[in-house]
Amino acid sequence: MVRLLAKLLRSTIHGSNGVSLDAVSSTHGTPGFQTPDARVISRFGFN
C-alpha cells in the first residue's frame, strides 16, 4: 500500500496532473484523492 501511494505521488510530482489519483479515486473510492495535487502531496508530508 505504501509503495502504491509513493508511486502515485511520484507520478503526480512528475506532471501527470493528478490523472492517476483521479483514476484510483474513482476505481477504489479512496477518500482524499480528489483534492488538488498540492493538497494530496502535503497531506502525505511531501511538502
UniProtKB/Swiss-Prot annotation:
Keywords assigned by UniProt, alphabetized: Antibiotic, Antimicrobial, Bacteriocin, Isopeptide bond, Secreted
Site (Basic bulky residue that acts as a plug entrapping the tail within the macrocyclic ring): 43
Residue location of crosslink Isoaspartyl glycine isopeptide (Gly-Asp): 29-37
Spans traversing the lipid bilayer: none
Signal sequence segment: none
CC per GO annotation: extracellular region
The organism's place on the tree of life at top rank: Bacteria
KW Ribosomal protein (keyword) present: no
Domain note: Is composed of a ring composed by 9 residues, and a tail of 10 residues. The peptide is threaded when the C-terminal tail is inserted throught the isopeptide-bonded ring.
Subcellular location: Secreted
Protein name: Capistruin
Record's comment on post-translational modification: It is assumed that the two processing enzymes CapB/CapC convert the precursor protein CapA into the mature lasso peptide capistruin. CapB is assumed to cleave the precursor protein CapA and to set an N-terminal Gly free, whose a-NH2 group acts as the nucleophile in the subsequent cyclization reaction. CapC is most likely involved in the side-chain carboxyl group activation of aspartic acid at position 9 generating the electrophile for the condensation reaction. CapD may export capistruin outside of the producing cells.
Residue ranges listed under propeptide: 1-28
Temperature dependence: Highly thermostable.
Impact upon substituting residue 43 to A: No change in thermostability
Source species: Burkholderia thailandensis (strain ATCC 700388 / DSM 13276 / CCUG 48851 / CIP 106301 / E264)
Protein's GO biological process: defense response to bacterium; killing of cells of another organism
Function statement: Peptide antibiotic that functions through inhibition of the bacterial DNA-dependent RNA polymerase (RNAP). Inhibits transcription by binding in RNAP secondary channel, where it sterically blocks the folding of the trigger loop, which is essential for efficient catalysis. In contrast to MccJ25, does not restrict access of nucleotide substrates to the catalytic center and shows a non-competitive mode of inhibition. Shows activity against closely related Gram-negative Burkholderia and Pseudomonas strains. Is not active against Gram-positive bacteria.
